[in-house]
Regions:
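Short beta-strand segments
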Residues: 13-46, 54, 62-65, 74-76
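Structured helix-beta-strand junction loops
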Residues: 12-13, 56-57, 129
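Short, surface-exposed beta-strand-loop junctions and turns on beta-sheet-rich folds
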Residues: 48-50, 69, 140
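Charged, gly/pro-rich active-site loop segments
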Residues: 1, 73-140
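A short, aromatic/hydrophobic, helix- or strand-capping loop or linear motif
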Residues: 20-22, 64-67, 110-119
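Extreme N-terminal tail/first-helix region
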Residues: 1-16, 72
Length: 140
């Protein structure tokens, strides 16, 4: 995919799979995400296994894919280190760098302009160092 196609694809999709690594091996979970300004934003429960694993080792691989039949398959793998942004868990403190991602995430998933803070989730940011994408619709 071109950069523009990748941006459009990641903006439209809703669920990604996040791979982390821990003492007992790989761990794979599905999460909602936001792609904004070439940055992947994830919100995670702070008591989740993935949170503890990312605290120990911030490296992650994220997969977003779509399509059912072979000729429809497309997707992207993003690899990089995850950063923890804002308070954990998130309670709504003023964190300027979260203002735009929270607004866009709230619109995408809840149809509102303001993020609800439940005191269980917190933000993760990945600025991928590697992106591999594919679009099998272009093959034929």
């Amino acid at each position: 995919m071109s950069e523009a196609e990748l941006d459009e694809f990641l903006a439209a999709e809703r669920t990604c799979r996040v791979a982390t690594s821990g003492p007992d091996g790989p761990h794979l979970t599905a999460l909602w995400f936001l792609w904004h300004d070439r940055t992947l934003w994830l919100t995670s429960i702070t008591r989740a296994k993935r949170w503890a694993q990312l605290k120990r080792d911030p490296q992650a691989s994220v997969l977003v894919d779509a399509g059912h039949d072979y000729g429809e398959l497309r997707g992207a793998e993003l690899r990089g280190d995850v950063e923890f942004v804002g308070e954990a868990p998130r309670t709504g403190e003023n964190v300027p760098e979260l203002a735009e991602p929270e607004k866009l995430f709230a619109r995408k998933y809840f149809g509102v302009d303001q993020m609800f803070h439940d005191g269980r989730h917190a933000w993760l940011r990945m600025r991928p160092h590697t992106v591999v994408s594919w679009d099998f619709r272009k093959l034929g």
